[in-house]
């Protein structure tokens, strides 16, 4: 390596300076003390003392002085006349980084010297990094990561995760690693903010380390495109060779076509408007490759070169044969002016008079390959030097320039090939040849003495000896009296002195002191990644002659880690062994990732280079803030004294180099030696002295036999293992079912040898042949589809194959065409077998297809059929959903049954309407011992409705709070339930942040790029829920503060709150004053959040409004009253609470031993019911608020409150659906809060064990026992007789919650719904051939119900069997005014409409055929009010090309 000795003074220079106050009484005695300018605690450091020509015994003392006291490092007498000695010490641990003073005292009988200088003492930083199990994640996946620390004595760390909006979504406090490693994980929500995320590790020092990963929706690619192009071409080239190769992740070539697009333009512009492009198309060959020779003469590279820097951008897109799947690759080509160029391998930044100046260059072509046997010329005008030589086989040319005759301070060198380029203007068309320039500056020495360290280029390998040549020339009048000259050297790395030594040169009388010698330097691990060497000698007159050099050291690790698989190629689902070799007792983190993930998002491979580039691994030399590099008053020669009263200081000028300026070693030095050359100065006005600002803490840096395949992970291995004392550990594991290549790696930490990293190990999961099934996601009973099984043979020989679809009573299957179950499959061939399948059963139907290679006496073509030794049979199982025709209906019958000594019974009749779809009826009976059992089991599935907006998401969040509180209070919380509930809370927290605005508010669909408006009601709901969730999960306090601040700004002088944003549930708009109802809700939320500052004014608003509310007749304001009752209960205003409850009691509906409340003008039901319909959302919500008002009484609810609440709880339980929720979101949240409080208030730990029997009028009977051990268990049985009569009996003592669920389908029939719904397809008929493969669905929707407008409306469009929606055409609907959100699933399209009036709204999108299906049945479109689910309309549509075409 050649030395880059920069001429300018940098902050990392050695500080060799006098302090003005230093006393020097030694005469000819010389001294130098060297110490690192930055010291690290808990790290051995050295201080080196050099005394020269002492004439008496002295005592040398070195001390570190800080605010904590004085610590002596060195205190010894020195008798020797000359001494060079280094002392080791370990700096103590300061509380924080601090500057300390290094005090040097040298004292003898006649002489005394003292000097003090500032050094920095700081804690040794642990080097920390983060590794994730893969670089990108899908929504809902678990993010696994490990924190790795190089410091075995690691202090507590804090990790947090930030999403793209910098929201803190997860946090771990005081994490302690085990042997330097800690693995953590967290789950992403189903709908997280997509984009880049950061894991931030905050170390004790305040320094942050960050690791990024990406969250996005993606489908793993099955193949990747590799584009091979030259790195560069010259302007004289006319052809570019572009090769595109494509292989599956399991290594086999892809068949298909490739399109290459080559664009020429300025690389700084991304837009193609700045580029000219060419396209070439070709077929991939049998190796999956295509090479194209592209003519580029039309781009006129020579003419354009000097106008703009040029480059070519190459994009290759491969289209897979058969599937049409596309994937791309990219390449870039730089355009250079010459066909070749020079690389300087050796050329110092400074020259020394009398010592040869060595130059080494390499001539390379445009690809970077060396060019041998070419003539190279050199010119050095100041030295009067010209020469020529021929490059060797490595393209190298070497020169040695005599510097003796140089009279100036610079040396300009020009190296060129063939001939000099004399024409450099843009108009020149002559070919330019390679040339390179270098300038070196003189090193200053008063005596013209110099030393130069010469070392070869390259990276030094660890654990070897490196030889450095030292060239010197020494002059001076006193040299003749010296018998010998001693050269001293130091080697530093990582800011510490590692090695010292010396070399003695004998001086011959009368001979010039000139020559060279070799120094052998052991290359140690502690020198990685860079070492610095300083050599110096002291002349008798005190002049220091020195040089320094840097060594690049191989980035090696002591802990040698090796990872391998045995065998390295395995069948899916077979056993393999992962073998790890490392230092004994190493803790190793293992990882293996599907190559498909890395194709989609390549990541930097964990390597020694990456580790040594981490913060904390770099040298950071230190210059004290108060120290000016030119402190001495006599440092420069003045041109002329100035007669002025102004203070002046001197500014050095010149580019000569001296010891002071070129020793880039990170040392602080104390010396009375001559180390600087005089510099010429001029004077400038000097500013008055300024005090340094107070010292601040450092700012934190922000700176991868038969097989049945069904297991397809993206990350296969993510484990920690400890290596045994032998240094080898083997882990047996099962290969996943994915046919791919797995990329694996290991990182290990050892207390003895530190960090080690393995190179990438690969395992090919492959079998010689396999089968893939093609089938639709779901069909409707009566439809038929073609099941295709494609078998691929990648063996070099032919196989006799049998393919079999396992028979089942759930479907019939007929082979298509002349397909046979046995056939011959040639080498590298594929074959598809097909069956026409008609499902007969409803529900999930399994299809199992097996292919097997068999022995056969018959030849396959001209070959004998072979049988592979392994992987002879492959079986794939896929599930098809078979649905009944018509519209799904569900009825739930729930009861809270409490028995004492006498048996309690209840009868139930399951009736079916006359036009029920055949075989679609099914029913089950459930028994639970706890009132919340069903909700606990189904907390993420409480209602069968979409969750796509900010308010609906909260039904996935808030109930978990009530469940955890309830189970905690009743001491029923298990680790399993707790883990799930906390996971749901964290996921809901992440999702809700999607709907936050920059001002701290929340709305149903977020800020829409700053266009949306915050919603007052939803913000209060989120604030309350986040505040309550703090007891269970991490909630960033800023989210609560931001919401509270925004709500405070919405409060009026009256104490009421103004409404902001849309209220999608217009029951909130139903009172005499919307603000009263809203204010009651917000007041309640603030009281539940323990945020009182604005509550007193809000309560005043409610009290002032009560008289108006109370005078309302016929229950006009019952919803508002229920909210106010709970708000005053929370505020502790018992008088007002009781007054409101008394008013509510007059308006209660009391029947069948139950109590509830209704609105006076609730919407009419839209259809005739066999059964009493489930109550609407508002009725459930207001009744639940009354229960909360009664049960939150202080200090405890009275017996009367409990008794009245029991009646309402009985009514509420009858409104529950089969999943434990209610009809919509807000009623589910409030009612579950009420049920949990009632359950806690009435919970009994008694050993009562009631039994429940359900019995039909026939022979069916099932008995359930409920006790303490299964209280939370949901026990269930299917009911066989539908229609039928059943009796439910409860005996023993205690309460049970019984629920019967009946489901069936009805054909679509004419009705009078609350919505007018029309559905049509375009084209209408099959005349257009495109209608068979894709067509447009158009919807027309208007509201015909009893209100002026609906609440939020959901339009649910089910897909025809075998069809999928064209996602971009659906997403485009979000641009329309009334469409707030769209969702696309495998089988449905959902449109969220903010509201619908009597004005018709129109929407359309395109669906396309994915898999052909025969006898297509119509698909259903359902439109319904989200909060009044009885307001619903249905329609159906058919494919234009289906038989019995019908659009309703």
Swiss-Prot record:
CDD domains documented for this protein: A2M_2
Segments of this protein annotated with the region Bait region: 678-709
Isoglutamyl cysteine thioester (Cys-Gln) crosslink site(s): 949-952
Keywords: Bait region, Disulfide bond, Glycoprotein, Protease inhibitor, Secreted, Serine protease inhibitor, Signal, Thioester bond
One Pfam short name: MG2
Annotated localization: Secreted
Gene Ontology MF, one: protease binding
Disulfide bonds: 48-86, 245-277, 263-289, 462-556, 588-748, 636-681, 824-860, 898-1295, 1056-1101, 1326-1441
Glycosylation: residue positions: 55, 295, 315, 387, 502, 751, 846, 968, 1114, 1285, 1398
InterPro entries linked: A-macroglobulin_rcpt-bd, A-macroglobulin_rcpt-bd_sf, A2M/Complement_sys, A2M_N_BRD, A2M_TED, Alpha-macroglob_thiol-ester_cl, Alpha-macroglobulin_TED, Ig-like_fold
Primary location recorded for the protein, binned into one broad class: secreted
This protein's GO CC annotations: extracellular space
SMART domains in alphabetical order: A2M, A2M_N_2, A2M_recep, Thiol-ester_cl
Stretch forming the signal peptide: 1-24
Family according to the record: Belongs to the protease inhibitor I39 (alpha-2-macroglobulin) family.
Subunit note: Monomer.
PANTHER family assigned to the protein according to its UniProt record, in alphabetical order: MACROGLOBULIN / COMPLEMENT, MURINOGLOBULIN-1-RELATED
Its biological purpose: A proteinase activates the inhibitor by specific proteolysis in the bait region, which, by an unknown mechanism leads to reaction at the cysteinyl-glutamyl internal thiol ester site and to a conformational change, whereby the proteinase is trapped and/or covalently bound to the inhibitor.
Protein name per UniProt: Murinoglobulin-2
Species: Rattus norvegicus
Gene designation per UniProt: Mug2
